[in-house]
C-alpha cells in the first residue's frame, strides 16, 4: 500500500470524529440521566412532605436515570480505547465511533426524558394509590430499555469500527 492511499483513508483529522463520538456518548447520556433525575426528584420531594415513608420506594426512577449515564460511560471508554496517537486511525473508524456515540447519547437522552416524566407523575399518583406501583415500574423499565437499545447498537458499531 502506498503512503498516498494510507493518507487518503486515514487523514489527520479522522481522530476528531472519534473524540466527538466519545464526547457525545458521555455528554448526551449524562444529560439524559440529569433530566430524569431532576424531573423525578421534583415528584419525590413533593410527596416527601406528605408521606415520608414512601421516599425509598420512590427512588426507583432516580436510580434508573443514573444507569443511563453508565451506558454512555461504557461506550465512551470503548471508543476512547480505539483511539491511539501511534496507530493508524481511518476515517471509517472515526465516523463509526461518532455514530456509536450519537446512538447511545441520543437514546439515553430520550430515555432519561421519558423516565423523568413517568417518574414525576408516577410518584405523585403512587402517593394516592399504592396499587399503581407495579404499573409504574413496568413503564419505567420500558423507558429504560430505550437507552439500552442505543447502547447495544453502539457496541455493535464499535465492534465494526475496530476492524474485527
Swiss-Prot record:
Residues 1-15, 80-97, 157-164 are lumenal. It comes from the Eukaryota. GO terms for cellular component: fungal-type vacuole; membrane; vacuolar proton-transporting V-type ATPase, V0 domain. It is a multi-pass membrane protein. The chain crosses the membrane at residues 16-36, 59-79, 98-118, 136-156. Proton-conducting pore forming subunit of the V0 complex of vacuolar(H+)-ATPase (V-ATPase), a multisubunit enzyme composed of a peripheral complex (V1) that hydrolyzes ATP and a membrane integral complex (V0) that translocates protons. V-ATPase is responsible for acidifying and maintaining the pH of intracellular compartments. Belongs to the V-ATPase proteolipid subunit family. This is V-type proton ATPase subunit c'. It comes from Eremothecium gossypii (strain ATCC 10895 / CBS 109.51 / FGSC 9923 / NRRL Y-1056).
